[in-house]
A protein has these predicted regions:
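Register position in tetratricopeptide repeats
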Residues: 240, 274-275, 308
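Alpha/propeptide regions of enzymes that mature by internal proteolysis
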Residues: 14-181, 210-243, 256
């Protein structure tokens, strides 16, 4: 294991373990328009997102990698909450860490300040580039072109949602060779500009691919799935506001994005029934039940809990499909 090769690196008070290895490329960034903050990462190591990426709404985003000090995530965010800038927080973290020479860290705070550090004993190619409200960093890369590719891709995608910009940067890094060992896992984490005091709701995007032959491809697929579900959620909100045309528009967009997703079709059909549009719902139910009979069984159970409002005869018509 790579950790066994570190005997020549004297790191006092820090016992390096294989679980702390995250030789990788990443980006931390803030959207100048929305204020959202994000971390994106890919590595040839299992479940990299659980070690490298940290973010909190209204506070900042942190990537901690190379020979990872996970505490930098929690402690760094705490320092930002105390009012430190990204640079001040980074300086404090490094001052307390005798393993700083093998660390790579980047921080963006809620005001858009950026700070980054690449230890002098990080494995080459290793470096970072900071720009306007973003930082890209990498170590153990195949070539020295990875960081510049990430930076240019992020800047070129201005105007797109931050999650898509982060993914574009990661794809650009991989196109330049990426991690010299290959690829295994990836993650994107996005948080809002401000906190509403509900941390359980304050991760706009939280996607991880822990073990995959092409993790960025899979991460991109998951991002599209999430976007489809966001349209479903927007449709649900429109129903609550009694705006059925808007609801059906949102549901329709979601189903076009995920045409094989029976769940989206099913709840759209249920909404139609609840809105007294059973004629439109029937062909949808017929298609769904043919694909998977369990949805018919579920339909029987919905009236009892108030999720399907219909007459007995209409319910019988649906169940007879």
């Amino acid at each position: 294991m790579l950790a066994l090769l570190l005997t020549g690196i004297h790191v006092q008070a820090q016992k390096l373990k294989p679980s702390e290895l995250a030789h990788t490329f990443s980006i931390v960034a803030r959207d100048s328009k929305t204020g959202e903050m994000a971390v994106g990462v890919q590595s040839h190591w299992f479940s990299v997102g659980t070690s490298v990426s940290w973010a909190e709404a209204g506070v900042g985003a942190i990537a901690t990698q190379s020979f990872t000090n996970k505490s930098f995530g929690i402690r760094g965010l705490a320092l930002l909450k105390e009012g430190r800038t990204a640079q001040q927080a980074l300086d404090q973290l490094l001052a307390d860490d005798e393993g700083r020479d093998v660390r790579q860290v980047a921080i963006v705070d809620a005001r858009g300040n950026v700070a980054a550090h690449t230890g002098k004993k990080c494995i080459q190619f290793a470096d970072h580039i900071t720009g306007d409200q973003f930082s890209v960093q990498s170590n153990m890369m195949l070539t020295d072109k990875v960081n510049s590719a990430m930076a240019e891709a992020f800047k070129a995608s201005s105007g797109m949602p931050i999650a898509e910009r982060v993914l574009a940067a990661l794809n650009a890094a991989e196109a330049e060779g990426g991690d010299i060992r290959g690829k295994q896992s990836a993650a994107i984490l996005v948080v809002p500009a401000k906190s509403e005091g509900k941390p359980w709701e304050e991760r706009t995007t939280d996607l991880r691919v822990d073990d995959h032959k092409t993790p960025l491809v899979e991460l991109g697929r998951l991002l599209k799935v999430q976007q489809a579900y966001e349209h479903m959620n927007a449709g649900d909100l429109a129903v609550e506001l009694n705006d059925m045309p808007k609801a059906m528009q949102e549901y329709g967009t979601a189903m076009k994005m995920q045409p094989e997703n029976l769940e989206m079709q099913y709840w759209t059909a249920v909404t139609l029934v609840n809105n007294k549009e059973i004629a439109k719902a029937v062909p949808m139910f017929k298609k769904i039940f043919k694909a998977d009979k369990n949805w018919k069984e579920l339909t029987k159970r919905l009236p009892a809990v108030g999720l399907l409002s219909t007459t007995e005869s209409e319910l019988a018509r649906i169940l007879a499909l």
